[in-house]
């Protein structure tokens, strides 16, 4: 049996440290080896034991988290998960941390409903496990899930020949998780101003997808924004599912639209790639082009197989360029992938598929 993932928690709030320690310690696949109130205390802790993952706050006294992150990545690289506030300032700092090498982001736990606390526990534990795997760039021992995995059946029926829509309009659907923020930037920066409409699910906490969309919008030639319920899918535009909401592709006459709605965690996620992919299989069928990028777990694999079976062109990111080769690996294993490509080749391949060549 593989040893538990060792985690060091660094946060200036004693309450947050204790809450995170309690949530993580409840998972048999995780061991909290220490907590620290600031980076200086953390450095002392690391002299005694080197963790597999550091859970790091950004705003701290004496030394902020970004400075500590830079030091970690230049002196002793380790997987780092950012534990951030949900403020606008916190979101911007989080994306700066991702540029410096952090591999995951979670929101600070807070008191709430039973459902909120249960879902927070799942997301935090999954983020830590994903970060631990990111260092290895390969799939390792898979621990038993602590909560049931619902499938896309929880949100909509599977595709059938009856539901396939006869149309020639192409639409692109993309799913990503760990490492996806940088992968999506590479993918979207390669898109021309008249690119086909794109719908994206990136596993990310609530309140961060808006800032992420604005960041991409400022550097890409296409328009990128957080999706709202009823949005029309348009050429030259990418819609990113809001954190904590599912996004489904729909068809309204001659146009594709998106439905943004609440619902249970599907494949332990909301938004779920499987939900987006299944809806695309139902309403776009062979007119969809799908890409599954870096990420831990299996969200999107079943949905990609459904897209493939309906005649869609499907692409998976290769292991060499993935931060975590989990979601693409599972999609390949299920037989739902037409092509396996390095990250920088995916956008050109998507455009060729949309052009019918």
UniProtKB/Swiss-Prot annotation:
<feature type="active site">
    <location>
        <position position="203"/>
    </location>
</feature>
<dbReference type="Pfam" id="PF01339">
    <property type="entry name" value="CheB_methylest"/>
</dbReference>
<feature type="domain" description="Response regulatory">
    <location>
        <begin position="6"/>
        <end position="123"/>
    </location>
</feature>
<feature type="active site">
    <location>
        <position position="299"/>
    </location>
</feature>
<comment type="similarity">
    <text>Belongs to the CheB family.</text>
</comment>
<protein>
    <recommendedName>
        <fullName>Protein-glutamate methylesterase/protein-glutamine glutaminase 1</fullName>
        <ecNumber>3.1.1.61</ecNumber>
        <ecNumber>3.5.1.44</ecNumber>
    </recommendedName>
</protein>
<keyword id="KW-0378">Hydrolase</keyword>
<dbReference type="InterPro" id="IPR035909">
    <property type="entry name" value="CheB_C"/>
</dbReference>
<dbReference type="InterPro" id="IPR000673">
    <property type="entry name" value="Sig_transdc_resp-reg_Me-estase"/>
</dbReference>
<comment type="function">
    <text>Involved in chemotaxis. Part of a chemotaxis signal transduction system that modulates chemotaxis in response to various stimuli. Catalyzes the demethylation of specific methylglutamate residues introduced into the chemoreceptors (methyl-accepting chemotaxis proteins or MCP) by CheR. Also mediates the irreversible deamidation of specific glutamine residues to glutamic acid.</text>
</comment>
<keyword id="KW-0597">Phosphoprotein</keyword>
<dbReference type="GO" id="GO:0008984">
    <property type="term" value="F:protein-glutamate methylesterase activity"/>
</dbReference>
<dbReference type="InterPro" id="IPR011006">
    <property type="entry name" value="CheY-like_superfamily"/>
</dbReference>
<dbReference type="InterPro" id="IPR008248">
    <property type="entry name" value="CheB-like"/>
</dbReference>
<keyword id="KW-0963">Cytoplasm</keyword>
<feature type="modified residue" description="4-aspartylphosphate">
    <location>
        <position position="57"/>
    </location>
</feature>
<dbReference type="GO" id="GO:0000156">
    <property type="term" value="F:phosphorelay response regulator activity"/>
</dbReference>
<dbReference type="InterPro" id="IPR001789">
    <property type="entry name" value="Sig_transdc_resp-reg_receiver"/>
</dbReference>
<feature type="domain" description="CheB-type methylesterase">
    <location>
        <begin position="165"/>
        <end position="351"/>
    </location>
</feature>
<dbReference type="Pfam" id="PF00072">
    <property type="entry name" value="Response_reg"/>
</dbReference>
<keyword id="KW-0145">Chemotaxis</keyword>
<dbReference type="GO" id="GO:0006935">
    <property type="term" value="P:chemotaxis"/>
</dbReference>
<dbReference type="GO" id="GO:0005737">
    <property type="term" value="C:cytoplasm"/>
</dbReference>
<feature type="active site">
    <location>
        <position position="177"/>
    </location>
</feature>
<dbReference type="GO" id="GO:0050568">
    <property type="term" value="F:protein-glutamine glutaminase activity"/>
</dbReference>
């Amino acid at each position: 049996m593989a040893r538990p993932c060792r985690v060091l928690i660094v946060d200036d709030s004693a309450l947050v440290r204790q809450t995170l320690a309690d949530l993580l310690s409840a998972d048999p696949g995780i061991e909290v080896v220490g907590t620290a109130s600031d980076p200086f205390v953390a450095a002392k802790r690391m002299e005694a034991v080197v963790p597999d993952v550091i859970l790091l706050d950004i705003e701290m006294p004496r030394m902020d988290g970004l400075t500590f992150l830079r030091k970690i990545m230049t002196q002793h690289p380790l997987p780092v998960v950012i534990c951030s506030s949900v403020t606008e300032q916190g979101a911007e700092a989080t994306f700066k941390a991702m540029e410096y090498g952090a591999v995951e982001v979670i929101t600070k736990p807070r008191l709430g409903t039973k459902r909120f606390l249960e879902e927070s526990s799942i997301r935090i534990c999954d983020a830590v496990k994903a970060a631990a795997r990111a260092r290895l760039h390969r799939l390792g021992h898979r621990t038993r899930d602590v909560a049931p995995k619902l499938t896309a059946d929880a949100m909509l029926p599977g595709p059938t020949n009856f539901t396939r829509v006869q149309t020639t309009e192409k639409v692109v659907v993309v799913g990503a998780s760990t490492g996806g923020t940088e992968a999506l930037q590479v993918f979207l920066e390669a898109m021309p101003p008249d690119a086909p409409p794109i719908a994206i699910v990136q596993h990310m906490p609530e309140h961060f997808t808006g800032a992420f969309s604005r960041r991409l919008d400022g550097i890409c030639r296409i328009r990128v924004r957080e999706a709202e319920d009823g949005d029309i899918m348009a050429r030259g535009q990418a819609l990113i599912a809001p954190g904590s909401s599912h996004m489904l592709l729909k068809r309204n006459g001659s146009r594709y639209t998106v439905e943004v709605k609440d619902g249970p965690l599907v494949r332990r996620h909301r938004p779920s790639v499987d939900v987006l992919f299944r809806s695309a299989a139902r309403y776009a069928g062979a007119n969809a082009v799908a890409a599954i990028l870096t990420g831990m777990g299996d969200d999107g694999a079943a949905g990609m197989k459904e897209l493939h079976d309906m005649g869609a062109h499907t692409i998976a990111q290769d292991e060499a360029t993935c931060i975590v080769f989990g979601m693409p690996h599972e999609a390949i294993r299920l037989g739902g992938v037409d092509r396996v490509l390095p990250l920088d080749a995916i956008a050109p391949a998507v455009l060729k598929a949309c052009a019918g060549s």
